Regions:
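Ligand-binding clefts/hinges and TM-proximal coupling segments of bilobed small-molecule sensing domains
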Residues: 19, 67, 144-160, 195, ...
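A ligand-binding cleft/hinge motif common to bilobed small-molecule-binding domains
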Residues: 80, 93-102, 175-204
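Periplasmic-binding protein-like
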Residues: 35-37, 112-115, 189-225, 229, ...
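Short helices/loops that flank or line small-molecule/ion binding pockets
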Residues: 62, 71, 76-88, 104, ...
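Extended ligand-binding regions for polar small-molecule ligands
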Residues: 54-63, 136, 143, 211-247
């Protein structure tokens, strides 16, 4: 009798534990996201990271139920964090052949035009990247433009941070500055350099992405990519872009 009661008790306990296990919600996935200060894609506003790519990422994460934080760092550190942390991601990353196998890719989050900026008091005759050969071009550590120009044999002067390049250009230490059109133009306007430094030649157009550590689950990457497709279709992405375009024109 006791044995039978013990067996019944074990069955009941087992069923209760099974039900509890089924009822327990799975923890929400968490991503540690890093980026650099590069307006209007990612920048500090009212104490938090905002911007075109940033706002798109936040919407997609919230809709997918993914908890996350976004931290501004110098690009080299932001990039390294995504490589080293199992739940790490970085944006806005150009999807180059050298980087392809290092990450799992989500997006695109935005697009960028790469432009050579030069001093306004010089006369420029640059209709192709080949015309810039022999000129000293300013870049910064870890940036895709740096490796792009180096791989094509251009003379590159690399700084630890992109903000050092406009002063170097004005001082005559470099001939040109390889920048993102929007981010570079924003830097010039904010610092009063937009009459002294001007766009000379657009040398590439690229899509940029949220690049995630290889340990991030494929199912999560697929869900987030679907989220980016959705915000493109339903107009959310364009609404975010227009909001920042209006801010730029209202300055």
């Amino acid at each position: 009798m006791r044995f039978r009661q013990l067996c019944i008790g074990l069955v009941i306990l087992s069923g209760s534990l099974s039900a509890m296990t089924r009822a327990a919600p799975l923890p929400a996935p968490y991503l540690s996201i890093t980026t650099e200060s590069s307006a209007p894609s990612s920048m500090l506003g009212d104490g938090r990271v905002v911007g075109i790519a940033t706002d798109k990422i936040r919407v997609v994460m919230e809709r997918a139920g993914v908890t996350h934080d976004i931290t501004l760092l110098p690009w080299k550190r932001a990039y390294a964090a995504a490589l080293q942390q199992a739940n790490g991601c970085v944006y806005s990353a150009t999807r180059t052949p050298e980087r392809e196998a290092l990450f799992k890719w989500i997006g695109p989050t935005d697009e960028a035009q790469w432009v050579l900026m030069g001093r306004a008091d010089r006369v420029w005759h640059i209709a192709s990247l080949e015309d810039a050969r022999g000129l000293r071009i300013g870049t910064y550590t870890g940036d895709a433009r740096d490796s792009y120009l180096r791989s094509r044999g251009h003379v590159v002067d690399t700084s630890p941070h992109d903000m050092l390049n406009p002063p170097k250009l004005l001082q005559g230490r470099i001939d040109l500055w390889a920048a993102s059109w929007r981010a570079g133009s924003d830097v010039l306007v904010r610092n009063g350099w937009d009459k002294q430094i001007v766009p000379v030649f657009v040398f590439n157009r690229v899509a940029v992405y949220l690049a995630c550590n290889r340990a991030v689950p494929d199912a999560l990457v697929k869900r987030l990519n679907a989220g980016f497709e959705t915000i493109e279709r339903d107009g959310t992405a364009r609404a975010i872009e227009r909001r920042y375009e209006r801010r730029a024109t209202s300055r």
